[in-house]
Regions:
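Low-complexity, intrinsically disordered terminal/linker segments enriched in charged
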Residues: 30-32, 159-180
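A mature extracytoplasmic/lumenal domain signature
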Residues: 80, 123-126, 165
Length: 180
């Protein structure tokens, strides 16, 4: 074989190897981008569902929306703890009786999502009368409060929920033991 033919063969082989390598890297990068986009879509969807939960389900006292967003075996810790949707839903309906028109979550100044988790701070407006004090939420004459909700999602539903509330009366707040 001539020296020039050998050099041409080596160059062609190197070009083929380089082409395959670039193609493989592009496919790997494409898969990473697709995975990132899917993850972003999931995170954004969970945050949107959480907005729906707070603004329509909770503040709008819409128990159907409230129930649809929680898993049937939801585990809840915080102001109203529960180990299933039936109890969580009943607790919510009991609390709804004390919410006046315009009470509830009025904004989400902070919303974060990572993987299957969301962390949302909700600004609340409500006046809970003394007659509701037995509901573990504490009575308050304050109009403004905050809630931090950490939620773990599975298939578009909340599977675990951890609610920390500061309703204007720090002495009655579940959140109080974490603020020092």
């Amino acid at each position: 074989m001539k020296k020039s033919t050998l050099i041409q063969s080596i160059i062609i082989a190197l070009l083929l190897v380089a082409t395959v390598s670039v193609y493989t890297q592009n496919m790997s990068l494409k898969k990473k981008v697709e995975k990132f986009e899917a993850s972003t879509k999931t995170r954004e969807g969970n945050l949107k569902r959480f907005d729906t939960l707070d603004f329509i389900g909770w503040s709008g006292k819409n128990i159907k929306v409230f129930d649809d967003i929680h898993a049937s075996d939801v585990h809840v810790e915080g102001t109203m703890s529960a180990n299933d949707l039936a109890k969580h839903s009943n607790d919510a309906q009991s609390y709804f009786k004390f919410l006046k028109e315009g009470d509830g979550v009025v904004s989400h100044p902070v919303k974060l999502a990572d993987g299957d988790w969301t962390a949302v701070i909700g600004e609340t407006r409500s006046t809970v009368p003394d007659t509701a004090a037995g509901a573990a939420i504490g009575a308050t004459t304050k109009k403004k409060g905050f809630m931090l909700t950490l939620a773990k999602w599975s298939d578009g539903k909340i599977k675990e929920e951890y609610v920390f509330s500061l309703n204007g009366d720090a002495n009655n707040s579940f959140l109080n033991k974490y603020i020092k």
